[in-house]
Every structure is written in C-alpha cells, then in structure tokens.
C-alpha cells in the first residue's frame, strides 16, 4: 500500500490510509506499505496524487472507500459490508459522513489551526529528509487550506469548527450509549472503520491534545474504540509501535 507515513512503523497520519490498514488486517490479508512524502511521488501510482493506493495482483486501486468495496469483493470473509439492505445503507451513510464531514474537521484542526500546524511541523514533519522538511509543511498547509475552502469547512472560524466537532462527538456518543455495540448494529462494518480512523488521529495527544481530551470525556466513545481495536489486534495506532517511520519514496 502506498501511503503517507505516520509517526512510527507502518502507521499513517492519513485516516483514509488507516481505514484501509484496518480492513486489510480485519480480513487477514497480508500486505506491505511504502511511505511517500509528496503528492509528486504518489502520482507515479495515482495521477491525482492522493493516498491510499493499493497495488494488488497487478491492479492499482485508489480511494479508500472504493478500496474497501473491492476488498470485500475479493475477500468476503469476515464481512465488513452488511447483507441486510437497511443496515448496509446505514453503514454507508456513516462511512460517507466520516469521510466527508468528520475528516475535514480533523484536517482543519491539524493544518489550518496555528497551534495544530506547529505541532505537525515539530512532531511529524521533521522526520522528512532535507530539504523536503523545510518546504513540505508550508505546501501541505496551503493545499489543505485550499481544499477545505472548496469543501466548506475552511470558510468557518476555528471556534465554530471546534464546536461542531464536539457536536459530532456528542452525536456519536449518544448513538452508542445504551445501543448496539457498533455504529450500524451488532457487527463491525466499514462505517465503524471510517469513524475510528478519524478518531484515532484526533486521539493522538502528541499532535491533537485538545481533541484527545474531548474524546476521553465521552466514555461511550472510548469503549467503542476499544471494542473496534479488540477486533484489530495487529493494527498499531498512529504513534504506538515504537519504530521510526522512514520515507521510502
């Protein structure tokens, strides 16, 4: 899998990449990662310059949601896509919400927010090789800001973004309290993976201590994340496996 690396090992600071990691591990599919450090390098595999990119049996698969759909087709057991049409629709809505709403709050707080950007530069970007580490942070911040403005989140103030993110956490916690063990029912789905991939990043205290505290204040979310990761014992969280992440491309 082609990805942007994380703080350690083969982890990633990209929720879409983390979502694919989770799906591959859950389905027991062996894989390797290759860490890139610029969209220009990624364009060798995906003309859009976006990760993740999964290379499988001579095919190039792009877009995390499309990759999960294809993994389900090729490796149906254990399933991540429910058979029941109503549950399947709910899981799809949850995944899309995580990808198109929750994710962009995280991007804003990591790249647009001044303190979040400072932490990214000092704790993550300094691992890049010279001279990339001098150039890449500013380029990445401008690209994130531009994308967020087109998407809409970038037009909001930091105060509004943080408030709306908290409301999202409240909605998730409310859904889980006294309800089924997973977001779409009794079984893990691709919707759970999409939300967990974002919240894992937001729970990384080194980079996002404020959002980590917000998650910790909601026991239902903490318990649900633990439940999800209990089914994914070989998935390291964004900074946990202890091995430095070298860029490889």
Model-inferred region functions:
Residues 86, 90-93, 160-167, 171, ...:
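A non-catalytic, amphipathic alpha-helix used as a structural packing/dimerization or gating element
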Residues 1-133:
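GST-like domain detector, emphasizing the conserved glutathione-binding G-site
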Residues 191-249:
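Extended hydrophobic/aromatic segments used for targeting, binding, or gating
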Residues 104-214:
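GST-like fold's C-terminal all-alpha helical module
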Residues 1, 39, 43, 140-145, ...:
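Short alpha-helical hairpin
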Residues 34-40, 186-188, 239-243:
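Acidic carboxylate-rich catalytic motifs and surrounding loops in phosphoryl-/glycosyl-chemistry enzymes
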């Amino acid at each position: 899998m082609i990805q942007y690396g994380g703080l350690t090992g083969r982890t990633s600071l990209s929720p879409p990449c983390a979502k694919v990691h989770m799906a591959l591990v859950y389905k027991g599919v062996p894989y390797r990662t290759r860490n890139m450090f610029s969209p220009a390098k990624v364009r060798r595999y995906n003309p859009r310059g976006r990760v993740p990119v999964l290379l499988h049996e001579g095919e190039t698969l792009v877009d995390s949601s499309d990759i999960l759909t294809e993994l389900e087709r090729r490796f149906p057991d254990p399933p991540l896509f429910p058979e029941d049409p109503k549950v399947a629709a709910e899981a799809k809505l949850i995944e899309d919400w995580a990808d198109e709403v929750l994710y962009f709050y995280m991007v804003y707080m990591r790249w647009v927010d001044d303190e979040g950007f400072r932490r990214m530069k000092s704790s993550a970007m300094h691992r890049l090789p010279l001279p990339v580490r001098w150039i890449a942070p500013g380029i990445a911040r401008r690209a994130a800001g531009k994308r967020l403005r087109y998407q809409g989140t970038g037009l909001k103030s930091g105060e509004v973004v943080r408030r709306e993110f908290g409301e999202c956490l409240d909605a998730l916690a409310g859904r889980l309290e006294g309800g089924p063990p997973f977001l779409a029912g009794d079984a893990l789905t691709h919707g759970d993976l999409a939300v967990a991939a974002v919240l894992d990043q937001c729970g990384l205290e080194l980079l996002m201590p404020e959002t980590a505290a917000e998650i910790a204040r909601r026991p239902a979310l903490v318990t649900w994340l633990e439940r999800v990761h209990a089914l994914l014992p070989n998935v390291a969280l964004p900074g946990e496996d202890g091995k430095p992440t070298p860029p490889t491309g």
